[in-house]
């Protein structure tokens, strides 16, 4: 959410580099006062994301370090603009803007209610399991 809040396009796709030839992706639409998630976050290849992007009729802003890493996959798609390198990572400014918009709507969350979203197991956990299972 933090990366895409800074942009003014109506439809935004966030593609963060997930390593292993994959991207962490999420789709958003800009709405008055903030952004609206169109699709939940997932893990996919750049080719899978490109195929999904082609199903939309609107112009799309593609942001994130994964979008830049696999730019050659997306450059041939019509209606897709890649955000520049300086905007590839979340910014504190965008986080404050999102938090302010929620605070104005009195949408408060207690710190202990925040939960991270894990789309897959971390490499270290997978490597540990693989190493222990091979013994």
Label every PLM stretch briefly.
Residues 83-135:
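Acyltransferase
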